[in-house]
Amino acid sequence: MPQEIRLINFGGVNCYLVKTDTGYILIDTGLPNKRTDLEKELESAGCQPGNLKLIVLTHGDYDHAGNAAYLREKYGTRIAMHYDDSGRVERGDWNWGLKAKPDRFSIIFRIGAFFIRPGHFDTFKADIYVRDGQSLSEYGFDAAVLHLPGHTRGSIGILTTDGDLFCGDLLDNLFGKPGLQFFIDDLAAANASIEKMKSLKIHTVRPGHGKPFPDGFIDEKSAKKQ
């Protein structure tokens, strides 16, 4: 049966709660200063300690990993992410693993980063390091991991068997037109990730920022937008 997906948005950052036959999967965890709001959303959906099977982080930025350590402790769950972003969450160093000069660092991103006040970040070590193509069926989630570097080295996507792609911060949809995210560390890697996505059966793209959009927007302009 189709898995129920709940979009949770606070401060322009998306988390996704997926209800499966055996419990819940949380994709990304939002900003630390939105923790109380996030917990209320989880509770209202029926997610509680004992039935949150897994937290999956699309990458290691503070606005996506900000509540992971807390939720792991409270809900008795595990955290999964790609190893190539591990230093970001273990050290709380948001420059870790990035180029000295990222390929795309737009003024819109700089303004947004200036105004965001994330709150205290609890560093942590992930329980599971996922790899490209890895199935998440053992957690009751009919989905597979896609390594989608570009925004960061360890960025991943999650593609369900129903064609829902959680793409993290590779793409966004903040101004009504989906496109490449405003911060891209490695543009060549991002282009390769877009090409990879084009070859897959995707129905809906669910980004880390902005509203979900149909897969028809994944075109060459998305990857080559400067």
Language model: regions and residue ranges:
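Short, hinge-like loop/turn segments at secondary-structure boundaries
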Residues: 95-102, 184-185, 223-225
